[in-house]
Design a protein with these regions (language model features):
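Short, contiguous pre-domain boundary segments
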Residues: 1-4, 9-25, 41-42, 253
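Catalytic cores of DNA base-excision repair glycosylases
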Residues: 32, 36-266, 277-285, 293-303
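Residues in the recognition helix of alpha-helical DNA-binding motifs
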Residues: 147, 309-312, 355-359
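Hydrophobic residues on short alpha-helical segments
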Residues: 269-273
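Short amphipathic alpha-helical interaction segments
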Residues: 298-314
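Short, cationic-aromatic polyanion-contact patches
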Residues: 324-361
Length: 361
């Protein structure tokens, strides 16, 4: 089974390892993996629907959140926003409130941007083909193919981290200390592996297999049904042990001390959105009031730090700051893609007047 070039990432490369993968090896993988999936498939609610909106929601939530945490939130979200139209029409502040606690809140804004675009441009009907899906705002290679496969049952490869790892190990060899091929080459290989008419089970099965059996750090090679055909099986244990040894040695010498999560910008971004979500609609908070809610020992001297966080959230469309933060010079010049704690060039007294709210739209 091969896919059309129009459905591949641009210019997929080839390499000697990929050229050496034989059809018989791929057939054996297809048989072994589909047999394993038939006996071990997880009963997940987004596998009982082909509604593109529900599939898209699951994919967005699962991108950086584990299945057990996503399950109740997926149901709750659909209670609140049962259709693309409902999501498109909702105030962004409500969307962010509903997403609160899942982390990486820009996913919620992207999800609503897709909903608004599909409602405005496609009468609320999600496109089917990969090139058109790729043209939607915030939809990348993975998500476009996930919708094409999991909503429309097209035989396209869906390559997430787990799938990449499984294909690499079984067909090419150990993926440690580093992969033998790059992502584009792996996409080209993945195109050859999708069984005709079985793309849905194939991709779901690969994802399950990668998260249950062929995990990144502790693959269950001893009980793995693919062991007889797996090119990594003879050496994967040794390769992982050597990699872990190298990590330990680096940890003893010059590795930086781990930073507690509660000290990170990501933690405080979440705290800011949670504090604003608890406010009445459009009420907002000054920087100092916001700081007191997210940090017990907050002091006015920390306004520039807090303003830096707010400026980054403002730029991501997750909050509205009034007055709007000036764009940092480094970003204007294209030299730095992301500002975190760097304060915009605003005087300390001016910062006291900044009000922050969830987006009004
Ligand atoms: S034998 Fe080990 S490395 Fe190969 S697919 Fe199975 S779990 Fe993964």
């Amino acid at each position: 089974m091969t896919q059309s070039a129009a459905q591949s990432p641009k210019n997929p490369g080839t390499s000697p390892p990929i050229a050496q993968v034989e059809g018989a090896q791929i057939s054996a993988l297809q048989t072994g993996l589909l047999d394993w999936y038939a006996a071990n498939r997880r009963d997940l609610p987004w596998r009982q629907t082909r509604d593109p909106y529900r599939v898209l929601l699951a994919e967005m939530m699962l991108q950086q959140t584990q299945v057990p945490r996503v399950l109740p939130r997926w149901h709750a979200w659909l209670e609140r926003f049962p259709t693309l139209e409902a999501l498109a029409a909702a105030p962004t502040a409500d969307v962010l409130r509903e997403w609160s606690g899942l982390g990486y809140n820009s996913r919620a804004v992207r999800l609503q941007a897709v909903a608004r675009h599909v409602v405005a441009e496609y009468a609320g009907i999600m496109p089917r083909d990969v090139p058109t899906l790729l043209a939607l705002p915030g939809i990348g290679e993975y998500t476009a193919r996930a919708i094409a496969c999991f909503a429309h049952e097209q035989d396209v490869p869906v390559l997430d981290t787990n799938v990449k790892r499984v294909l690499h190990r079984v067909l090419l060899g150990p993926d440690v200390p580093k992969p033998l091929v790059n992502d584009r080459q792996l996409w080209a290989l993945a195109e050859r592996t999708v069984p005709i008419g079985r793309g849905y089970d194939w991709n779901q099965g690969l994802m399950d297999f990668g998260s249950i059996i062929c995990t990144a750090r502790k693959p269950a090679c001893l009980v793995c049904p693919l062991r007889p055909i797996c090119r990594a099986a003879p050496t994967i244990g040794t390769a992982l042990a050597e990699q872990q040894g190298a990590r330990r040695r680096a940890g003893r010498s010059d590795a930086p001390a781990a930073v507690p999560f509660t000290s990170t910008a990501r933690f405080f971004r979440g705290q800011i959105l949670r504090a604003l979500g608890a406010q009445p609609a459009n009420a907002g908070l000054t920087l100092d009031a916001l700081g007191a809610r997210i940090k017990p020992d907050y002091a006015a001297a920390e306004r520039p730090w807090l303003h830096g966080l707010v400026a980054a959230l403002h730029r991501d469309g997750l909050v509205t700051a009034d007055p709007a933060p000036a764009r940092p010079a480094a970003v204007r010049d294209g030299a730095a893609p992301y500002m975190t704690e760097n304060a915009a060039p605003t005087a300390q007294d001016d910062l006291a007047n900044v009000r922050v709210t969830l987006p009004h739209g």
